[in-house]
UniProtKB/Swiss-Prot annotation:
Modification type Phosphoserine: residues: S40
The protein, known as: Calcyphosin
Cellular compartments per GO CC: cytoplasm
MF terms (GO), sorted A to Z: calcium ion binding
Subcellular location: Cytoplasm
Ion transport is among the record's keywords: no
Binding site for Ca(2+) 2: D70, D72, S74, T76, E81
Keyword DNA-binding: no
Protein task: Calcium-binding protein. May play a role in cellular signaling events (Potential).
Positions annotated to bind Ca(2+) 3: D106, S108, D110, D117
Organism, as annotated: Bos taurus
InterPro entries associated with the record: Ca-bind_SignalingProt, EF-hand-dom_pair, EF_Hand_1_Ca_BS, EF_hand_dom
Amino acid sequence: MDAVDTTMEKLRAQCLSRGASGIQGVARFFRRLDQDGSRSLDVRELQRGLAELGLVLDTAEMEGVCRRWDRDGSGTLDLEEFLRALRPPMSQAREAVVTAAFAKLDRSGDGVVTVDDLRGVYSGRTHPKVRSGEWTEEQVLRHFLDNFDSSEKDGQVTLAEFQDYYSGVSASMDTDEEFVAMMTSAWRL
């Protein structure tokens, strides 16, 4: 393990100390920082973002992380590659079941899950807020998607956003068998 790997472990531990959604929250935050939509951050943006989140890296660690994910020598790091590396690693069995659950939800096969995709696999009719008249079934479906969606809450969930969410859940479960059983039951796979 080199210095950057050690730094990523340190960052990952700091994220996971925030709970199962720690990685997801960091991913949302950094995607929001990417104001120009370039899917990259420079050292200053990364440092400011980490500081705002209360995640601490020294200058050498920050520079090492940026060098590792600066794919084109532009002085910026590839945001998605960085976030993928930040996620706690999942075994092949865990990755496969997360991908299978996403594929089940993505009924249109276009790589994103929308409210329309959910209608066939998730019913909000029995949700307490629908039964009380407080929400519509559409609102329940949107709220459900928002659990996985990025900070933009655009009503579309990508596989990366779905993985961000489940990487945090995965980190809290000791065995592949336990995680796979939970996913299989939750998504009726």
